[in-house]
């Protein structure tokens, strides 16, 4: 995975820089997401690593994408096809979205709780995380009854485990050592 990310990063960075310059970050995110879905299609996957010439592959891929990808997006796809990198489109799209969130000072936080959180609780968590991370936070909430009580928050590299299950696990580990 690290190798794919290394290969995809320059394409994502170039697309992101261009999108910022043209004030089209959202439309580029949509284009790259669509192209990534096309590249993951079961019919398309064998063609990406197949024996088609790069220009034929680019024409085919752009034809499948149709109006969903503009002229500049098509140019990116042609360059990627020439370099045999179309299979990295999902990673390019993911990196682009990460750059978009970083640029917009946004972060997604996953909150797993033992019971459903009220809108007030979600608001409190969101405000606290925004202060701590100095970013706009989008919460993705889910329920896992095995936590017993409390919650686990994951936002980027930050993990806060305030669940009873986590506390019992840490207590068990400390008693065993």
Swiss-Prot record:
GO molecular function: proton-transporting ATP synthase activity, rotational mechanism
Compartments (UniProt record): Cell inner membrane
Organism domain of life: Bacteria
Membrane topology: Peripheral membrane protein
Pfam family for this entry, one: OSCP
GO cellular component: plasma membrane; proton-transporting ATP synthase complex
Keywords, sorted A to Z: ATP synthesis, Cell inner membrane, Cell membrane, CF(1), Hydrogen ion transport, Ion transport, Membrane, Transport
Subunit text: F-type ATPases have 2 components, F(1) - the catalytic core - and F(0) - the membrane proton channel. F(1) has five subunits: alpha(3), beta(3), gamma(1), delta(1), epsilon(1). F(0) has three main subunits: a(1), b(2) and c(10-14). The alpha and beta chains form an alternating ring which encloses part of the gamma chain. F(1) is attached to F(0) by a central stalk formed by the gamma and epsilon chains, while a peripheral stalk is formed by the delta and b chains.
NCBIfam families: ATP_synt_delta, PRK05758.2-2, PRK05758.2-5
Protein role: F(1)F(0) ATP synthase produces ATP from ADP in the presence of a proton or sodium gradient. F-type ATPases consist of two structural domains, F(1) containing the extramembraneous catalytic core and F(0) containing the membrane proton channel, linked together by a central stalk and a peripheral stalk. During catalysis, ATP synthesis in the catalytic domain of F(1) is coupled via a rotary mechanism of the central stalk subunits to proton translocation.
Family note: Belongs to the ATPase delta chain family.
Record-given protein name: ATP synthase subunit delta
Gene that this sequence comes from: atpH
């Amino acid at each position: 995975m690290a190798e794919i990310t290394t290969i995809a990063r320059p394409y994502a960075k170039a697309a992101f820089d261009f999108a910022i310059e043209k004030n089209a970050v959202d439309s580029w995110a949509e284009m790259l997401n669509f192209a990534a879905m096309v590249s993951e299609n079961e019919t398309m996957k064998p063609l990406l690593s197949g024996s088609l010439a790069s220009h034929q592959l680019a024409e085919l891929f752009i034809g499948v994408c149709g109006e969903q990808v503009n002229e500049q997006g098509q140019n990116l796809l042609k360059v990627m096809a020439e370099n045999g990198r179309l299979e990295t489109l999902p990673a390019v799209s993911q990196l682009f979205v990460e750059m978009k969130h970083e640029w917009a000072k946004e972060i997604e936080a996953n909150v797993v709780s033992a019971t459903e959180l009220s809108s007030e609780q979600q608001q409190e968590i969101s405000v606290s995380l925004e202060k701590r991370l100095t970013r706009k936070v989008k919460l993705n909430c889910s329920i896992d009854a095995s936590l017993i009580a409390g919650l686990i928050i994951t936002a980027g590299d930050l993990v806060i485990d305030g669940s009873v299950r986590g506390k019992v696990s840490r207590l068990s580990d400390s008693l065993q050592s």
